[in-house]
Amino acid sequence: MLRSTFLRSAAIAAISALAFSAGARAEEGKELHVLWSGGQYGDAVEKCINQPFTAATGIKVITESPGGLAKLQAMNEAGNITSTVFDLPTDELKRGTAQGLLEPMDWKAIDPEPMYDEAKDKYGIGTSYFSTIMAYRADAKAPKNWVEFFDTKNFPGKRALPDYPGYTLVFAALGDGVPVDKLFPLDLDRAFKTLNRIKADTIWWQAGAQSAQLLKDNEAQYAIAWSGRVVGKEGIVTSFQDGMLDLSWFGVAKGASAAEKAAAWKWLHWHTNAKNQACVATYISYTGPSPDLDPLLPKDKLKEYPTYSENKKVQWLANAQWWLDNADVVEKRWQEFKLQQ
């Protein structure tokens, strides 16, 4: 008992010391703490933005993975905000906003260079576009649209689908003939009807790399996949037509110090620079929010990028607000559907 009491006291003291240390550094304005997913995208940002940003401003960017809303919620509940910037998918940006966990963006302080309006949110800045698209083996019969993609009679083969309702139900609705401009509010009955029809030919994937691997190994002949995993891969054909365009966001934690917020606004400005975005895109085929990006990208790879003008115009934007408003209903029906598989 005495030992556990001592350990708890020591832990609390350590957390307090860390909080004081982080606060002191933040007040000096010499460090910016970022929680993000990291990976290949993180490596690219480190080379193209973080290192030159530090060289120019003297502000060191300290990153930690993984990021996400759960980390921000935990810090908020503990009353100890030790990181300032968090990377968030669109749905988590909306949830974090609804829960009051994010600071409003100071767009005057960020002073962004030209960027798409959809990437400017009151509580977040969209810095990286990605697409969810149709992919299939080069030796498979080519579908022209989502109705044909889900037609296993005339286009035989296994379908590799994301084991996530937000990335599957929308395309299943399109597969039942729902027009793109009538997609929301989503008709769940039509979406599940499509999935039930092809359940014998469905393989579910949970990690993005699985979609490409299933196609490569010929375990699946068709897939719904994230563009960065399949575009440009040997033996795989892709189409951005009626794909879902989405953004990854950075948000700033409510309760962060004034000094770290000031550093965050400076750092986020660098993400709006087209040349910096083009540099990132040379490492991973996800693009930033600049409308001036196309001329800066490698001409031989233009068709691989989500925001290439010819790709962007044939896609539709994810509707995170609908998913937030209907999360409980969707999750209940999704779990019921999966239990029947």
Where are these regions (language model features)?
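A ligand-binding cleft/hinge motif common to bilobed small-molecule-binding domains
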Residues: 91-97, 216-217, 221-236
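Short beta-strand->loop
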Residues: 102-110, 122-126, 222, 234-244, ...
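Conserved C-terminal helix/tail region of periplasmic/extracytoplasmic solute-binding proteins
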Residues: 312-341
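A bilobed periplasmic-binding-protein/Venus flytrap-type ligand-binding module shared by bacterial periplasmic
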Residues: 131-140, 173-178, 247-260, 279-283
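Mature extracytoplasmic/periplasmic domains
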Residues: 253-318
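Extracytoplasmic ligand-binding site segments that recognize negatively charged/polar headgroups
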Residues: 37-46, 81-83, 87-216
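Early extracytoplasmic/lumenal segment of secretory-pathway proteins
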Residues: 27-96
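Periplasmic-binding protein-like
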Residues: 115, 129-132, 189-197, 234-256
